[in-house]
């Protein structure tokens, strides 16, 4: 019976400390947030687990633009983009995003999606259906993995960050169309893919690169244009996917690529064609977000975030060495503190929450077995005092955890 089967599966997850449960935020996304049950009095917590890297999710100007967009366009789009749901706000947003990516991708055109998951599925299923072979980085995000599976294409995986191994796979391939698929900033480790080396390999073997810059767009680069600006890359072989619900603070995602590729997606990508367009108000708000990211305020926020990252890493390095944990090789706002054991990661997360600090414990299958961790993420809305409090609280919790484990 289905219910009995599912109950056994749930019991197995519980036994392995793998059960996931949702939490309810009663206030806006911000470092200081109230969290609790739907009818219970919420608890104020200092949070280090959102992807709101620039602190724009609760920005007054963006919230005002969202309300302005709703007043102008209404609450919803009413149809898919190819029927009647493609608004002026959507078109303006796509034009601005194409302008942002034009220095890095010749003849760039942009296409807006409701979510990053949809954008990744759209690109991989549409381009993968052309008889391509997909050469996928081993630590890609789940949406890229699912997209590759749904594409029903030949898929080959290369080890994390290993351009040499990728080169060998491409050299051995006889497929006419070769697509390299990689995250830019890896979501659970925070390190950056060696895109310059990957691009050299792509050019040598007449391949194309699909880059998911979910955690780089808005954060990396002098103007916040993302990983391509950060690394100084330019090529028509780049197919860029950016997320607008993380550093940009709103919702959605986009694909930027040579106009021929984008027109192909408009006409063949099922996740784009067969869904209702996002509310135009969201696109309208994103135009304000882009102005902030590229302006002086955005530069100031990125500079502040860089300082917080250095402060956190310096403190975590000491704590990890003392506790026998490890600190990931990340220079981004994603800082993994790798504890190892699932139960230990949950216990550390719970100990922090008991002191008023919320940090998520990440366990398999999201990360490999034996690498359970606290995924600490920073926002430009955090203060140096917030980071100091986190470090002090981890320092107090660590000895007790080791005592209980002994």
Swiss-Prot record:
A molecular function (GO) term: 8-amino-7-oxononanoate synthase activity
Reactions performed catalytically: 6-carboxyhexanoyl-[ACP] + L-alanine + H(+) = (8S)-8-amino-7-oxononanoate + holo-[ACP] + CO2
Superkingdom of the source species: Bacteria
EC number: 2.3.1.47
A Pfam family of this chain: Aminotran_1_2
Coiled coil: none
Residues the record lists as N6-(pyridoxal phosphate)lysine modifications: 246
Assembly and interaction partners: Homodimer.
HAMAP family on file: BioF_aminotrans_2
Protein name: 8-amino-7-oxononanoate synthase
Taxon lineage: Bacteria, Pseudomonadati, Pseudomonadota, Betaproteobacteria, Burkholderiales
């Amino acid at each position: 019976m289905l219910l009995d089967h599912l109950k056994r599966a749930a019991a197995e997850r519980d036994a392995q400390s793998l059960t996931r449960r949702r939490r309810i935020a009663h206030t806006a996304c911000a470092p200081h947030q109230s969290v609790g049950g739907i009818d219970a009095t919420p608890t104020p917590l200092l949070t280090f687990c959102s992807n709101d890297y620039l602190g724009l999710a609760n920005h007054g100007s963006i919230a005002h633009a969202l309300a302005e967009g709703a007043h102008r366009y209404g609450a919803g789009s009413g149809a898919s983009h190819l029927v009647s749901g493609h608004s002026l706000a959507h078109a303006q947003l796509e034009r601005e995003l194409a302008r942002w990516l034009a220095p890095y991708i010749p003849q760039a055109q942009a296409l807006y999606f409701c979510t990053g998951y949809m954008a990744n599925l759209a690109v991989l299923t549409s381009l993968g259906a052309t008889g391509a072979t997909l050469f996928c980085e081993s630590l890609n995000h789940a949406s890229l993995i699912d997209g590759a599976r749904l594409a029903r294409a030949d898929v080959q995986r290369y080890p994390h960050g290993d351009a040499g191994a990728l080169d060998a796979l491409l050299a051995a391939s006889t497929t006419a169309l070769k697509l390299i698929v990689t995250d830019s900033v890896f979501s659970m480790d925070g390190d950056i893919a060696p895109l310059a080396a990957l691009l050299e390999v792509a050019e040598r073997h007449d391949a194309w690169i699909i880059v998911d810059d979910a955690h780089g767009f808005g954060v990396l680069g002098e103007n916040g244009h993302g990983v391509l600006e950060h690394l100084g890359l330019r090529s028509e072989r780049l197919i860029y996917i950016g997320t607008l619900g993380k550093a940009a603070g709103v919702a959605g995602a986009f694909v930027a690529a040579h106009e021929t590729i984008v027109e192909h997606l408009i006409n063949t990508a099922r996740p784009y064609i067969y869904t209702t367009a996002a509310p135009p108000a969201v696109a309208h708000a994103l135009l304000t977000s882009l102005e902030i990211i590229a302006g002086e305020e955005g530069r100031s926020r990125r500079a502040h975030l860089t300082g917080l990252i250095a402060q956190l890493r310096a403190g975590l390095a000491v704590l990890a060495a003392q506790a026998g944990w490890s600190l990931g090789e990340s220079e981004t706002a994603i800082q993994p503190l790798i504890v190892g054991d699932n139960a230990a990661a949950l216990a550390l997360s719970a100990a922090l929450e008991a002191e008023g600090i919320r940090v998520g414990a990440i366990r398999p299958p999201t990360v490999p077995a034996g690498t359970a961790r606290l995924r600490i993420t920073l926002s430009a809305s955090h203060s140096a005092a917030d980071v100091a409090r986190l470090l002090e609280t981890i320092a107090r919790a660590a000895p007790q955890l080791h005592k209980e484990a002994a």
